[in-house]
A protein has these predicted regions:
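Short functional linear segments
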Residues: 1-44, 53, 57-64
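Class I S-adenosyl-L-methionine
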Residues: 9, 60, 97-100, 198-203
């Protein structure tokens, strides 16, 4: 059996595969439906990982089962995939290897860790998949989930070569991580962006929660999310 650490080390210099149709086909329709219902997708310029970790901490306190997928890691790849219990990710490598062979593609590091985390979540029948987006949202690898629950932490001028030069362009890129949003949590943003969210996204969002808390106090933001979801 291939060791997950060795598998990932071989991916370090491989360019990521952004063909979302390919990546989506890694999952069955049933699996995608489960992911859509049970995933908390987190997008934003700053505060994504800390928000994800705070939500995970709150879930663990109530004995809820979860996997939190975040990036990047500081010391060890396992930091990207934390769960309420110890998991052996080695047993899921075969899924990736078969997928790459079948489609004649090489997955990048980010794609590999994301797909493994999602597969482990599905196979362990967990309550929540907390999923931090990589860059942007609309064309991000994690958008294959089409989550019904999306969290927007903050908006700033990042990756403008990919996401656009205007704050409004970046906002649209990030929120459109899913076209299937039913519940949207938004941390403090400027008035213009709040008005855009209220006017443009109420058509497909059943509930929009605007937090009064700054992202620097995102434990409070995370508590708001946690309260509404439970």
């Amino acid at each position: 059996m291939t060791n997950f650490k060795n598998y990932l080390e071989a991916k370090v210099n491989i360019r990521g595969n952004k063909n979302l149709n390919y990546l989506s086909s890694f999952f069955s329709e049933t699996e995608l439906a489960i992911l859509s219902n049970k995933t908390i997708s987190i997008v934003g310029t700053n505060g994504k990982s800390s928000t994800a970790n705070n939500i995970a901490m709150l879930l663990k306190g109530l004995d809820k089962s979860y996997i939190a997928f975040t990036s990047p890691h500081l010391f060890d790849y396992k930091e990207r995939m934390t769960a309420h219990k110890d998991l052996n990710f080695n047993e899921y490598i075969q899924y990736l290897e078969n997928f790459e062979l079948k489609n004649n593609i090489n997955l990048g590091y980010f794609e590999s860790t994301f797909l493994i985390a999602a597969k482990a979540f599905l196979h362990n029948d967990m309550d929540y998949f907390i999923c931090e987006a990589g860059i942007g949202g609309k064309y991000d690898t994690t958008s294959v989930i089409q989550s019904k629950t999306v969290v927007l932490t903050s908006i700033g001028l990042d990756h403008t070569d990919i996401l656009g030069n205007k704050i409004t362009d970046i906002l649209n890129q990030k929120i459109n991580v899913s076209d299937n949003i039913e519940t949207l949590f938004v941390s403090v943003l400027n008035k213009e962006l709040i008005e855009i969210i209220k006017s443009q996204y109420t058509n497909y969002s059943q509930s929009i929660y605007l937090s009064e808390y700054l992202i620097s106090k995102n434990i409070l933001f995370s508590n708001l999310i946690f309260k509404e979801l439970n």
